[in-house]
Amino acid sequence: RNEQLAGGFSFGGRETFGLFYFNPWITGDHVSLNTDFAKVDFDHPYLPYRIKNKSFELNIGRYFGYERKTSIGFEIEDMNLVNDTISINYQYFAPQGFFIYDTRDIYANPTKGILLRQAFISRIDLKGELESSYTWFQSFSVYKRLSKIDNPKPWILAWGIKTQMSIGLKDINFMAALGESGSVRGWQYPRNANYNDPDQSYRFGFHNLKSSIELRKVLIPRFPMMDLYEFGLTAATFLDWGVTGRNEFEDILRMRPILGAGFSLQLQAPFVPILRFDYGWGFYEGKRIDKAFHIAAQHMI
């Protein structure tokens, strides 16, 4: 029951094809299975390669009550990075998993509770030529209602912190970047010119530490339409902070952060957790460096 089978494709600058299957009751109460096959072909945003990737993924999940959720699984990938003169191939087995502790009252726009997440991904070279790598993700968020309980349009304070730590092989082709809708808003996603600029090396690394705070105001409380879909609208101001580094994790604690500040409109709509529109300004060492408009399909916090 409630099984889902879906597929999709796109053509143009990013060519994709995928099949997805999800069964929330694969062996009984609270045990789920999801699996997918994907094929993608697109230009790397800041490295001089075209990425051609085929992957298969399978995960088993389990709820323990309403507040605890776990998942364990793996992904098998065949990835090629190509340009006119170079072709690099990766084939790896990638165990992955997560644990979530969640006491939020409303997932779409929580007014109280906490969200704790621990997750890992790994890459084990199937050809036996490369050292394995492991990445550990941690996040913690807290939500506080600032208005009286009977106010249908409350003020809400949301704060969150996230870390990413890489262990093992640090391959430059898998390096992450700061400054986009999911890390520090108010910055355009980096391009090749940013990556090749030594004065912007503070945006690229294997480890990172990020924090965000939002003051939210519900403008339109959630309401049903056709007894099937729910809509709502929330406005917010935000301040984001982040650092990233390439050597040891503790080194980033001594680095100057990049900042982002701005405004957000968050639409509760069908088929996505949230539809978020952000506009902000990016700062580094006390100077405004960038400005950007972002669209995302999930909360920042």
Where are these regions (language model features)?
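Short, glycine/acidic-enriched loop or turn micro-motifs at the edges of active sites
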Residues: V243
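Short glycine-rich, acidic/polar surface loops and turns
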Residues: G260-Q266
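Outer-membrane beta-barrel and related beta-rich outer-membrane complex signature
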Residues: L47, V82-I86, L169-A176, N247-D251, ...
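Secondary-structure transition/capping motifs at alpha-helix termini
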Residues: R1, T27-D29, S147-P152, I220, ...
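Short, contiguous acidic/charged loop-to-helix segments that flank catalytic cores in large enzymes
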Residues: D197-F204, E248-M255, S264, F283-E285
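C-terminal outer-membrane beta-barrel translocator/porin domains of Gram-negative envelope proteins
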Residues: P95-Y229, L233, T237, N247, ...
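Short basic (Lys/Arg) and small-residue
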Residues: D240
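Gram-negative/organellar outer-membrane beta-barrel architecture
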Residues: R1-R117, G182-Y202, I274-L275, G282-I301
